[in-house]
Design a protein with these regions (language model features):
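Extracytoplasmic/secreted proteins, especially bacterial periplasmic and envelope-associated proteins
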Residues: 91, 130, 134, 167, ...
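Catalytic His-Asp segment of secreted/periplasmic serine-dependent ester chemistry enzymes
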Residues: 199-293
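Oxyanion-hole/transition-state-stabilizing segment in secreted/luminal serine hydrolases
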Residues: 98-111, 116-118, 132-177, 182, ...
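N-terminal secretory targeting modules
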Residues: 1-92, 96-107, 111, 277-293
Length: 293
């Protein structure tokens, strides 16, 4: 795999009509484009083509009503640019990552993170609702040139399950792979821990079964053949022998982890992989997790 300079764009399978393919700040033309609902910006939409197999692997900005998603991303870019230089851990993902807590939330990381990783300088770039394509867009428009993480922890794909009736599961696995490729190209010195999608809902539920099949498809990509990539699968820790979720580990929505038991387990399982990657002392002099000022 060719490792590019941070400022270079990753080669994608399809080029949309997006006016600014990378970089920050955004031009007025780019802002106008990405404030359109996401379905209007999907690959092929500009040619009136239906290409759902490309949705998970081609960058697309996320969308909440109005400017909320873009404003959230902009706050994260500002946070990254205020914390330049060496960083121990960069967290990338959706709401499950965000709920380690982030600079946009309660101002400090949750109890499990602080217990196991609080001495590491950490930036959390988790945004609720994000899919693989949104992560790709954020990585290309995130002002990340100013930081140098030693380790990136990526968990993404859960929200892609809402669209697997159209996309299928293999493109989602390919989208996760593209996120890893993007991270490896932007941060060639960093290790990557890829966390496989957590089970959700119940056996027999489409969401549950599509997650299972996506993780199987991900296994077939053998991403861990790259010596700087580790893959973590918590499925067996999160379910009972009959496949049902362990209720103590999840919230009532059967998607998100319980802030106490769920994240405590997640942190314990992450810790050996983190310690393997961060073999020397934490970066920077303050040696602490970055939180909201």
């Amino acid at each position: 795999m060719r490792i590019a300079n941070k400022s270079e764009a990753v080669d994608y399978a399809y080029q949309t009509a997006e006016p600014q393919k990378q970089g920050w700040p955004l031009t007025a033309q780019e802002q106008e484009y990405i404030l359109k609902p996401e379905f209007q910006r999907r690959p092929g939409s500009e040619k009136n083509k239906y290409l759902p197999n490309l949705w998970p692997i081609v960058p697309s900005a996320g969308f909440w009503e109005g400017r909320k998603w873009l404003d959230t991303h902009a706050q994260m870019v500002n946070h990254v640019q205020a914390n330049t230089g060496s960083v121990d851990i960069l967290l990338v993902g959706d709401s499950i990552t965000q709920q380690w807590n982030s600079p946009l939330d309660v101002g400090k990381f949750n109890t499990a993170w602080q217990k196991h990783f609080g001495h590491y300088k950490t930036i959390n770039l988790g945004i609720g609702g994000d899919k693989t394509q949104n992560i790709l867009w954020r990585l290309d428009h995130g002002g990340l040139e100013s930081i140098d993480p030693r380790l990136v922890i990526l968990l993404i794909g859960n929200n892609n399950m809402f669209f697997t009736p159209e996309t299928g599961v293999d493109p989602v696995a390919n989208g996760i792979q593209m996120c890893v490729v993007n991270l490896r190209e932007k941060f060639p010195k960093a290790d990557v821990i890829l966390v496989k999608i957590f089970p959700a809902h119940a056996p027999g539920n489409r969401f549950y079964e599509d997650i299972k099949q996506t993780n199987i498809a991900l296994d077939k990509l053998h991403l861990e053949i790259d010596p700087k990539v580790q893959v973590l699968d918590l499925t067996s820790d999160l379910i009972n022998l009959d496949g049902a979720l362990k209720p103590a580990l999840f919230l009532q929505d059967k998607i998100h982890l319980d802030q106490d038991a769920g994240y405590a387990l997640y942190a314990r399982k992450l810790k050996p992989l983190v310690e393997k990657s961060l073999r020397v002392k934490p970066a920077a002099n303050d040696n602490k997790t970055i939180s909201k000022q």
